[in-house]
């Protein structure tokens, strides 16, 4: 696989490597490799949302989301790329975590067109972003290249599917209980 160069435009909150969005300031790093069309990612997000929110609110972890386009072929409109690019627009608007959650709540089934850009914009607005700025970002394709870069970097890091959850570099089962236990263990080990 040829290494892709870092896209010229990265969302606010992007990691220094450009391969994810960092949220929070806690000492334990939790990497979340997700695809917005992945039903198991939705299951993880909905099942672990309270834990993720608590980790952020209590400054226990820095969450690094890696929005991938792993499942682009499972939709007729490259939905994974469009949704991941839109998450970058939401990050610019300071509502990344809220947008991710709302996008998973409204997840379309695999095999179809996915949500339209208008529907994605409505989800962004419900998550609290400015409609005009978000629609402009989405419409001009500002972060359209970014999900392919994120996916390439994830493959180089050994990610073979979504969701992949890593705590301080160690893969764990993608569920709330495993996440809680792994973060607690990482805190003890530090």
Segments predicted by a language model, with ranges:
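Extracytoplasmic thiol/disulfide redox context detector
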Residues: 1-75, 151, 185-190
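A structure-centric signal for secondary-structure junctions around beta-strands
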Residues: 18, 27, 83, 161-162
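A mature extracytoplasmic/lumenal domain signature
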Residues: 34, 67-69, 103, 138, ...
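Extracytoplasmic/secreted cell-surface and envelope-processing proteins
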Residues: 41, 73-74, 113, 173-176
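Extracytoplasmic/secreted proteins, especially bacterial periplasmic and envelope-associated proteins
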Residues: 43, 47-51, 81-85, 95-98, ...
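Sec-exported extracytoplasmic/periplasmic mature domains
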Residues: 43-46, 53, 57-60, 88-95, ...
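C-terminal cap of thioredoxin/glutaredoxin-like
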Residues: 51, 125-190
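Structural microenvironment flanking redox-active thiols in thiol-disulfide oxidoreductases
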Residues: 55-89, 96-122
């Amino acid at each position: 696989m040829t290494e892709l160069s870092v896209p010229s435009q990265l969302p606010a909150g992007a990691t220094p490597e450009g391969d994810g969005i960092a949220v929070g300031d806690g000492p334990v790093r939790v990497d979340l490799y997700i695809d917005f069309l992945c039903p198991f990612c939705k299951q993880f997000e909905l099942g672990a949302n309270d834990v993720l929110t608590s980790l952020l609110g209590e400054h226990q972890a820095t969450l690094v989301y890696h929005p991938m386009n792993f499942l682009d072929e499972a939709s007729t409109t490259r939905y994974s790329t469009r949704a991941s690019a839109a998450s970058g627009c939401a990050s610019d608007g300071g509502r990344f975590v809220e947008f991710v959650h709302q996008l998973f709540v409204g997840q379309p089934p695999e095999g179809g067109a996915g949500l339209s850009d208008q529907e994605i914009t409505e989800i962004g607005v419900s998550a609290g972003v400015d409609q005009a700025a978000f629609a402009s970002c989405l419409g001009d394709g500002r972060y359209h290249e970014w999900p392919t870069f994120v996916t390439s970097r994830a493959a180089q890091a050994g990610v073979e599917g979504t969701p992949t959850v890593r705590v301080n570099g160690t893969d764990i089962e993608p569920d709330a209980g495993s996440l809680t236990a792994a973060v607690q263990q990482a805190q003890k080990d530090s």
